[in-house]
Amino acid sequence: MSSKGFEIGEEIKEQNFFIDNRLDASQLFFVIYLLGEKLHTISLSEERPSIRYEGSLFGVIGGTLFINGTTVTTGYSKVGELEVLVVSPQTAETMFFLINKEDYFVLGSDTIASIQTQGNAQVVIHEDTFIIDDNEEFVYFNNAPIKGHHYVKGVQIGDQILTHDFLLEKRKEQWKLTTFSETVVFNQESFLRQLPAVEFPKDFPKYRRSPRLRLEPPSDKFKIQKIGEAQKPSKNGILRAIVPPLGMLAATGVTSVLSGRNPIMMLGMGSMSVITATFTVSQYISEKKEHKIEDQKRKEDYEQYLIKAVAEISDKYDEETEVLHFRNPSPEKLAEMIETYNSRIYERMASDKDFLVVTLGTGNQASNLSVDSDINDRDNDEKSLRVKHLVEHFSTQREVPITLNLSTQTLGLVGTYPVLKTAVANLLLQVAFFHSYRDVNFLSLVPEKSYRKDWIQWRLLPHFKIQELNMRGIVHNAHTRDLLLNSFYQILNKRKQVLKDAGKEKPKFVPHYIFTIFDDSYLSGHGINEFLAEDMSELGVTVIWCKEDQKLLTETVTALVEYKNQSAGEIINDNKIYVAKSFEPYGDVPLLEKSLRKLTNLEHVEVEKNAIPESLSLLDQYEVKKVEELDIQERWASAEPNKSIKSLIGWRGKSEYMYWDLHERVHGPHALVGGTTGSGKSEFLTTYLIGLAINFSPEDIGMLIIDWKGGGIANTLDKLPHFMGSITNLDGAGTARALASIKAEMDKRMKEFAKFGVNNINGYMSLYKSRLNPKPDTKYPEKPIPHLILVSDEFAELKSNVPEFLDELTSVARIGRSLGVHLILATQKPSGVVNDQIEANSTSKIALKMASEQDSNELLKTHDAAHITQPGRGYIKVGENEVYELFQSGYAGVPYDPDDTTVETVDERIYQINGIGQTELVYDPGEEVVQGHDTSDLPTQLEAVISEVNRVFEASNLTLPAKPWLPNLESKIPTPEVTQTAELNTKIPLGLLDIPSKQTQENYTFDITDSSHTAIFSSPGYGKSTVLQTIVMNLARQNTPEQIQFNLIDFGNNGLLPLKELPHVADIVMLEEVEKLQKMMERISSILFYRKSLFKKVGVASLSQYEAKTKEKLPIIITILDSYDGLGQQDRRKEDIDNLLIQLLREGAALGLYLIMTVGRVGAVRMSMMSNIKTKMVLYLNDESEVVAVMGRERVTQEEIVGRGQVMLDIPTAIQFYLPTHDGNDVKLLEAIENDVIKMDKAWTGKRPKKIPMTPEELSLEIFEEYSEVMQWQREQKIPMGMSYQTTEILGIVPSAQPYFLFAPMDDDQMLLFQALLLKQIAKIKTGVLLVDFNESFEEVLAHHSLTENVTLITDKNDAKDVIAGMVGYVKLAKKHENGEPMLLVISNLQDFIQKTNLPASDFVLALKNVYKAGLDVLIFAPHEYIAKSFDEVPKAIRQLKFTGMIGSRAYDTPLIKGTSSSREPELSIQDAYFVLRGGSSFDKMKLPELTKGENND
């Protein structure tokens, strides 16, 4: 339960259950004590109705307690192995009381008991002692069970005794008893019942400073008067009084004697003289007595005066003594005050004059009283000496605290370590008591060997927690030295820079550091020494040096204190002035660690200044819980932007709203906002802008964000209907775009105002809002133009990086007033950034926390903003201080939880504090305990308000204004959907144009028939191949292969390869494919020639004319050439290719043939080519001059973005080229292209363009025989032997088509291949074969190939006559024009055959010329050297025949081929040969199938 019950008795009556102060008894169901070897307590409440503990489940359902499923009532129970005591708040009661220690206070069942219970256990309290008897019942003392009789234990604060009937606790000042049933009887005479005593400050451990009692020592002036002088008697007065009468008597007597006169007469005269003398003596005696009485009275009066004066002085003197001791209590006294959490804790603040004033001990010092007297040095009588003694006594205060001010000094302490350790401990204790850890932090360098003995007890004191570093400020080894001193050095550097920037007015640094150095070895070689060599007080640091000898101290010491021993010390210097003031140092504080620990408990909560909250949420700012309560719809309806455009930016006091109104007649029209990093500048601007959205509809207010850094505010507000765009990434291209957009908006507004005859935005919007109730002959606008709030976050970056953009903003500030454009320029450092024009037009300024006083002065003309410490707090200044207010702005990023009913719960996680004072989690019970429910998935208040604004807008009939700033072009834009049409459609979407001067972004339509030949210039890696893909794919999607066809030539990195399977693509060729490229060029050339001839024949000049005249459709053929400059200048093919391309550029467009090519360098294209390229597009080029060469000086500033380029419309215009698919994902782009290609390939069943005929690189016999043409040949009893390189047609032996078929290999290996291949192929036909191999040339091949049934092998030369006879028979049939049985005669070696048969050359030639006509085909094998170059009659003769054959030699090297060829032709591979017809007059290079090793070894 909370400490509320400690305050007033009424609350005790309402809630009188105090078992656990942490729990609210009203929410509590049961408290369960588990009675085992150790007592455990479980509390079940509304917040936590069930818990599992050590395998047992405790829970409350419907007010009933269940333990492991068993119902349990209050009191003692046993559930299985568990013994429990269940307590219910409904039947329990807690009371507090006092007892007489000398009496026996009994709790038990005896009738004499002070508190009579039903149980047998008995507890007796007497003289601070417990006497406990369990009497066979359970009793727990401090959670441990007690068994037996007369268990005696001394009473300690915190002791607890649990029995069946009660829980007894000893508190600090009272006894606390909780009884568990209503049967307990109280003997009220045995104790004094009380309200619970307050043991801790209110809201403990939170602590707030109390109003300080500021006592000043009296300074009265006193002057002690000396005693008045006594009246002195006349000197010889008695003689002067009696001598004359006596003299007269003597003279009379002498005269009488001498003259002889009458003696009687003389007697009379003598008597008179005697009488006169007698009276005179009597009078003298009387006066002397009176003088004595008066002198006595004088002395008595003076004594009374002295008593009164001394009493008066003593009162003031004692008052002064008390004040001195009050102001600076001894450390021991402070420990007593800490024990009771005295209200004087943390009473001193940095602004107090006694800030960091400490006392070193007690001694004598001059009194503040002025006591003087008028006694001079010559007055030495007793009274005077006494007065002098009094004056001397009251002029000195004795045994009073001797103080020293540490705030502006460097202190040097001299003495032994034990003495100095005590002295420093006492100093730090005083500082820690009187000064908050928010104002003062400690950093001490102590010896490693004495850390655990002397300093470890200080480790938890919050003053030793360096707030800026989150580390403990005790350096006691090398590890802590490295961590702390390096970080502290950085703090000092920052402060030094702030001090340097501050100028004349010195800043006050918080916290102030007390830097105590016992062991300076840690400083060796450290950069911090440069600061220690100077006065550090200006940096908010007091250094205390502790040395055994004065000689070891540094020269920076301004206060020097010497401790001679534990009981004698002397202040030698104070503020560099010799004072020689002795004192008696304070001794060690008893139980210092206890005092430190108690002081550590406090969490200092500072009092709110000016009632401005330290933090404020967005909805708190409006004092609502739900966004619906904002009444946004009503606010929009009642808004009058022509009079005010105010927004609530925060509070200037408790519920005192602070509005900012940029209307030109209030705080506007423009403003400056300043705030350093962490000041909450972006959050403030967000709060201001969302406030505008709350108060005004999108028709009234729009906002445009300029953010040099990108993101930021724009990302948080882009969902608002008021949001009109963001200008980010202001590099070269972005700047030009932004300038054009802003200028276009200003121009648009001026034109619109002029159009409707108004001169400002108020007049325009008044007309707009009046359109629903029109007046005759009045024009009304149909579109709203809102006030535009133009926010530039960090415009200092703009000035340094994009000065021309800031110039445009300056122009906006100058002319935007009447146009409804309001400029807010925000920056971290306004110094040197704000020019005169901006300053003159920025009526209001907002300054949040500024980095320096100079920056604050730049905005506010005061230093106030430099001293702000809280994010979101700032000053608003309008004009010349017409408004000057401090405010706290609302923060919109807090979770939106309108149903929040926060319940404080106990965080059960356990942390350990490591060696440097940081916390580390060591135990987590399973889930993080948070205050209230989990808010991690909740939207922020900003998001909730934006959603509400959108809801209100969507429910309204308001018109969304046109946006002046369109979003930056996306870097990846999928191509729009295109569909195929029956008619040819050459117009395709190619990219998105960005035209800021017209405030529009629109599709760029590319029409090949209009754009004609096109060149795309781009450096490598910027998407030129992707543009080609987009062109090809979109044209292919819209048209069939009968309408558009493509020739793909890729001189780059296979960018066109994904398109090769399109049904529209004739073929694709790479630069390295020499032969295929040559064929592609020939194909293009032949098409040009064919169409020119065709058009000439029809009598037309262009494709459109041809189609109109003949009604015949010809496909448009587009040659796509990627990376033209990949064809190097040294390439021998370049000249031919360029010539063909020039011809295509000149003649192709009219014939329906177009070229689209990409080029990496403008200079790579010949002028003759460039002049014939109608359309030029540019992507990013590394050389800016090339962009100028293509686009001119008005080029668009380049952006280094893939796919970003420019095209020439009326002027160069930026474009983002579309991706070739509808999926904008890079990873899936290639896959998407392939899928689309496959779909189109499968969908098209019509006629396709012919591929470039090419033999495969690998042509195995299996692949060869799978060709349909090969299979057709075999069905027709032809013998396929290979494939034409030029046409890929099948070449081989066609029966009855030639006098003979010649095999002329270059070497034995090729001979074996020819032989093996022939055997393989003749095995596939049914025609009979006669293999004549007299010299066994086929022996090696036949060893691996078995002959089929249709082959007869003749090796015996005796069979030669039969062979010749057979040939003669066929000759005869030929002459009769008859056909014999089809037969193949294979002569394995011509030279050997002639030798063995002795057949004359003429007869052999005659046979060859005729036998093939009758059905006998002769196949002759002869080495090339023999058949081609021998002068024997037979080879010489048969060379003249129109034979067909396979020649293994280069064309240049053989006379068997009649035609021109190059000597640079490479040697033929074993798989290559020339296929010759008509005796060599026609020839074609062919590729032979490759026989695998297995096939050769069949």
Swiss-Prot record:
Q: Which residues does the annotation say bind ATP?
A: G675, T676, T677, G678, S679, G680, K681, S682
The molecular function terms in GO held by this entry are: ATP binding; DNA binding
Record-annotated disulphide pairs = none
Cited CDD domains: TrwB_TraG_TraD_VirD4
Please give the superkingdom of this protein's source.
Bacteria
User: Keyword Glycoprotein on this protein?
Assistant: no
Provide the alphabetized UniProt keywords: ATP-binding, Nucleotide-binding, Repeat
Q: Does the keyword ATP-binding apply?
A: yes
Residue intervals of the FtsK domain: 655-857, 1001-1188
- PANTHER family, from UniProt? SPORULATION PROTEIN RELATED, TYPE VII SECRETION SYSTEM PROTEIN ESSC
Question: What is the designated name of this protein?
Answer: Ftsk domain-containing protein CA_C3709
